[in-house]
């Protein structure tokens, strides 16, 4: 199952970009044997039209994806093993691509949120959208490690 990350804004060179790149590379290597990956990142411009304009661009970026999952403070809070099981379930159902949507500073357009198949939250706190990319990349790698039985995830 391919994975797409559609996000508002450009991730410039720096620690966040380094972390995202590292975790997505790890996910690619670990996930390959599990039928997960590769990951593609589709960045859309932050727009003056706010959420509506960004939502339109994000919607186009994920068109055709079999699963669309928003990352939103109103979403479901999962444990890392539950997230791994969710990815495994989507893969086992034969879904060819799961797309994760990260909104801009104002969040995700309500119309796009309503169309999503799933909504995920990294907790009740609000996170900067650039940090959410790092957190998602790490959780994708952690999920692949859990599914592979690798020792990365310890409890």
Task: Label the predicted regions.
Residues 1-3, 37, 115-117:
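Short glycine-/polar-rich loops that comprise or flank the Walker A/P-loop
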Residues 5, 69, 103, 136:
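Conserved RecA-like P-loop NTPase ATPase core
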Residues 11, 73-76, 104-107:
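Short glycine-rich anion-binding loops that position phosphate/pyrophosphate groups of nucleotides
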Residues 15-17, 79-81, 110-112:
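Short glycine-/acidic-enriched loop or helix-start segments at secondary-structure transitions
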């Amino acid at each position: 199952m391919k994975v797409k990350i559609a996000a508002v804004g450009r991730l410039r060179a720096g620690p966040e970009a380094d972390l995202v790149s590292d975790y997505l590379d790890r996910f690619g290597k670990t996930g390959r044997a599990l039928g997960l990956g590769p990951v593609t990142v589709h960045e859309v411009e932050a727009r003056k039209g706010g959420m509506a304009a960004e939502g339109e661009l994000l919607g186009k970026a994920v068109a055709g994806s079999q699963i669309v999952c928003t990352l939103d403070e109103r979403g479901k809070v999962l444990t890392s093993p539950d997230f791994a099981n969710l990815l495994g379930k989507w893969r086992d159902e034969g879904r060819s691509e799961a797309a994760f949507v990260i909104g801009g500073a104002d969040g995700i357009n309500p119309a796009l949120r309503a169309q999503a198949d799933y909504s995920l939250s990294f907790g009740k706190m609000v996170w900067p959208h650039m940090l959410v990319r790092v957190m998602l990349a790490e959780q994708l790698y952690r999920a692949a490690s859990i599914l592979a039985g690798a020792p990365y995830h310890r409890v």
